[in-house]
């Protein structure tokens, strides 16, 4: 099993400016992550997700993370999403 802090640290190691929020959806291996980074600017949603999955590849391969619900935002898109939430 991997801690929520470890997930956050691994994402931030790959995306140093990232704001990362991680929640356990059950069992410790089903997680939800919201990642906000300027590195996502100009990238497709698929590419954004690949960037995060790449940061967590070892945890995913070892099944320390079994399922990951992922939401990615640029800082600008996050500002809009927070206003409409």
UniProtKB/Swiss-Prot annotation:
It comes from the Bacteria. InterPro entries: BolA (IPR002634), BolA-like_sf (IPR036065), BolA/IbaG_stress_morph_reg (IPR050961). Gene3D superfamilies: BolA-like (3.30.300.90). Belongs to the BolA/IbaG family. This is Uncharacterized protein ssr3122. It comes from Synechocystis sp. (strain ATCC 27184 / PCC 6803 / Kazusa). The lineage of its organism: Bacteria, Bacillati, Cyanobacteriota, Cyanophyceae, Synechococcales.
């Amino acid at each position: 099993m991997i801690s929520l802090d470890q997930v956050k640290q691994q994402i931030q190691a790959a995306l140093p400016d990232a704001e990362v929020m991680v929640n356990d959806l059950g069992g410790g291996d089903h997680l939800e992550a919201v990642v906000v980074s300027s590195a996502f600017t100009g990238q497709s949603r698929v590419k954004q997700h690949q960037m995060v999955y790449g940061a967590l590849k070892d945890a995913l391969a070892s099944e320390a993370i079994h399922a990951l619900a992922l939401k990615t935002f640029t800082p600008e898109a996050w500002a809009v999403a927070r206003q409409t939430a």
